[in-house]
A protein has these predicted regions:
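N-terminal alpha-helical transmembrane segments of multi-pass membrane transport
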Residues: 2-133, 273
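Loop-to-transmembrane helix boundary motifs in multi-pass membrane proteins
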Residues: 10-25, 182-191, 229-246, 250, ...
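Extracellular/periplasmic helix-exit of transmembrane alpha-helices
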Residues: 112-124, 276-298, 360, 364-391
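Membrane-interface interhelical connector segments
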Residues: 297-314, 372-408
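Flexible loop linkers connecting adjacent transmembrane helices
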Residues: 2-8, 41-47, 74-93, 118-140, ...
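Helix-loop-helix module between adjacent transmembrane segments
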Residues: 9-19, 23-33, 66-71, 105-110, ...
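Transmembrane-helix boundary/entry motifs in multi-pass membrane transporters
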Residues: 8-16, 51-56, 85-103, 138-147, ...
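Membrane-water interface regions at transmembrane-helix termini and the short interhelical loops
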Residues: 3-10, 35-50, 69-90, 137-144, ...
Length: 675
């Protein structure tokens, strides 16, 4: 069997995407194994080059992402739904917020919750009195973990959800560029987009796994279960955790993993509450309010600050802010895909508010509780002991807990939380990598692919950590995130173009229902209004008014204009319907349908003696629906000729708009683009 046949029959992978990615990764691993010192020098030079020449770009790009989302949220484009106009959200608002809250949790908060504020507090980036230094330390931490990170996630998530649920394209990164590339998203340019996204995601996940492995080793050492946190131990940790993640991915125990994830969130929240209560509670609550104010009041200045006038701080700026911005870029497809999948049916305004505000507020709370408490302990009971350990940030959380009650219990809980975050991140990472690398997002990936991704992530993480520790992982993230950040700016332009095409398309209205009313039929109209229609009445209307109107129009379109037209009668389904479909070769078919829609009637109306015609708890109406997902309207007062006129109005709208903006929105069905 040839390689191409094998790839087609035995995998869901896109040969070019996976081939280019594996070539890059294998080349990197080979270089490290064959010439470790030279490769280390090369990575350091590349990292220094990006710091020196592209830091400004990262700063401006992240400000653009945030500004872009804010503009969308306050404009009329914010009213657009992520799905059809009548689409209801898949999850309730509170459930959706809870899932966004879950997306904001992870290994990073456990690793940096204590370490980062304390490190900034003791560095020369903060100045003045101890109180002022503490305030600035929290400010810089919150800037790194706040709304900018979620603006990056939100940009990708919004593009994925919009083009996936509104344009009916596959939930894939290449789909986000449809307004710019059209059908070329299915060609080599689409493959290039996926390659860049795959590399960024791969190294972003690997970096997170590296942080998790080093902190798990430190936790085991702190609890006295091992003698030292060695590299060999971290290899064992990565192997064990990745084996569990692979088992989860191939065994169909997703429901069990979901339960573990919910348990883990509960444990993390309990740990947060414990530190809040066991620490200086009133001080922390006051600091939480103060930190929010300090963060918001300095947000604009920090968003554009490159330290060009403070050269003594450029090393700190590169090693913290720019590395974070690169990490968030590489992590964005991972988090963005999750957010997109749970956000169907939300308006863009609601989506942006939820994604930017809820996780950011939780991040402020987390770093306030852990960061402010750590600094408070370091300056008090710990007498500087915690500050002496900032060069080993993986150990700081456990040393920090030693100064609080029940340190043995909380240390064990922290270890469990980190382990479960590690497992669920790796499991989800396997899914996302499979999704990006697949040639058809609707295909189920074979089990061996999960094993391949798990082994690949483990090997690359181990090799990079062995050659240069976490610094090498961060260097690779920085390198692959730069082109992806450029890609994201193009994504913003593509999304803007799509949204404006959408607004122009759907703002073109057709006057429904009563536009045809004239005074000569007022008695008939009144009689219809005074009748509480039931399903049998609507079925009769569909069969004796709508269907004959469609047949008459179909006969004219076929006989005189040689169009391909069909009528679908769907009287046996839960919502009886009839459809007129005018078929096209390249564009999406025009479809005008009418279906029976039931709605509940309130008890007050039924019991009102002045409304004797309302006797039933349900009333039914014939509502239109269309090929492009627009919200329909009631047509029960139309006669046969008026229905034909209504269908022609929509067909004229279809033809005039399709040549202008509609071709970007309605040119293809989802199945065609998934092939």
């Amino acid at each position: 069997m040839s390689l191409s046949k094998f790839m087609e029959k035995q995998t869901s992978l896109n040969p070019l995407v996976i081939g280019a990615t594996l070539f890059f990764v294998v080349l990197l691993v080979a270089m490290i194994l064959i010439a470790p010192e030279q490769t280390q020098t090369l990575l350091n030079a590349a990292k220094s080059g990006i710091f020196a020449n592209f830091s400004w770009f990262y700063v401006l790009a992240f400000s653009v992402f945030l500004g872009f989302l804010v503009i969308l949220s306050v404009s009329s484009l914010g009213n657009i739904k992520l799905g059809n106009d009548e689409e209801e959200p898949e999850f309730g608002f509170l459930s959706w917020l809870a899932m966004l809250f879950a997306a904001g949790m992870g290994v990073g908060l456990m690793f940096f919750g204590v370490a980062e504020p304390l490190t900034h507090y003791l560095s020369d980036i903060t100045t003045g009195s101890a109180e002022h230094k503490q305030q600035e330390a929290l400010l810089h931490t919150l800037f790194h973990w706040g709304i900018h990170a979620w603006a990056v996630y939100g940009t990708i998530a919004l593009a994925l959800a919009y083009f996936g649920f509104r344009y009916k394209l596959p939930l894939a990164l290449r789909s986000c560029f449809y307004p710019l590339l059209k059908e070329r998203i299915n060609g080599k340019l689409g493959d290039l987009i996926d390659i860049m996204a795959l590399l960024a995601t791969l190294f972003g996940v690997i970096t997170t796994l590296g942080f998790g492995a080093s902190q798990l080793g430190a936790g085991l050492h702190q609890l006295g279960w091992i003698s030292e946190n060695s590299f060999s131990l971290q290899v064992v940790v990565i192997a064990v955790v990745m084996s569990l993640a692979i088992f989860s991915a191939i065994s169909g125990v997703g429901k069990g993993v979901k339960i573990l994830s919910e348990l883990n969130l509960t444990l993390a929240f309990c740990l947060l509450i414990f530190v809040l209560v066991a620490g200086p509670t009133l001080y922390l609550l006051s600091a939480f309010s103060d930190n929010i104010g300090t963060y918001l009041s300095n947000l604009v200045q920090l968003s554009f600050k490159t330290y060009v006038y403070e050269q003594e701080h450029t090393g700190w700026f590169s090693g913290w802010t720019i590395l974070y911005w690169a990490w968030w870029c590489s992590w964005a497809p991972f988090v963005g895909l999750f957010i997109a999948r749970i956000s169907k049916g939300r308006t863009i305004r609601e989506f942006i508010f939820g994604v930017l505000v809820i996780p950011s507020m939780f991040g402020i709370l987390w770093f306030t509780v852990f960061g402010n408490t750590a600094i408070w302990l370091n300056d008090g009971e710990a007498a500087g002991t915690l500050g002496q350990m900032i060069s080993s940030p993986e150990t700081l959380l456990f040393k920090f807990l030693d100064y609080l009650p029940l340190s043995g219990v909380t240390g064990l809980v922290s270890l469990v939380v980190i382990s479960l975050f590690f497992i669920t991140s790796a499991d989800s990472g396997i899914y996302v990598l499979n999704n990006i690398a697949s040639r058809d997002k609707s295909l189920a990936a074979p089990r061996w692919q999960a094993v391949m991704w798990g082994v690949l992530m483990s090997v690359v993480a181990i090799v990079l950590m062995q050659s240069g520790g976490l610094a090498n992982l961060q260097a690779m993230t920085l390198l692959v995130a730069l082109p992806f950040a450029i890609l994201m700016l193009l994504m913003c332009f593509s999304l803007w173009k799509g949204l404006n095409a959408d607004k122009k398309y759907f703002d073109t209205k057709v006057n429904p229902t009563s536009i045809f009313w004239t005074g000569d039929k007022w008695k008939e109209r009144l009689e219809q209004m005074m009748n509480q229609t039931q399903e049998k009445d609507i079925l009769r209307f569909l069969k004796h008014t709508v269907l004959p109107a469609m047949r008459e129009l179909r006969q004219e379109l076929i006989g005189k204009y040689d169009l391909s037209v069909q009528i679908n009668t769907l009287f046996e389904q839960d919502e009886p319907a009839v459809e007129l479909v005018i078929q096209k070769d390249l564009m999406r078919d025009f479809m005008y349908g009418v279906k029976s829609i039931g709605r509940e009637v309130s008890e007050q109306l039924i019991n009102d003696d002045n409304l004797p015609h309302i006797q039933h708890s349900m009333t039914y109406e014939p509502y239109t629906y269309f090929f492009d997902g627009r919200v329909g309207y009631d047509v029960q007062y139309m006669d046969q000729d008026e229905l034909i006129a209504d269908m022609l109005k929509h067909y004229e709208r279809y033809l005039s708009l399709l040549d202008d903006v509609g071709q970007e929105l309605m040119a293809h069905e989802q199945t065609e683009l998934a092939e």
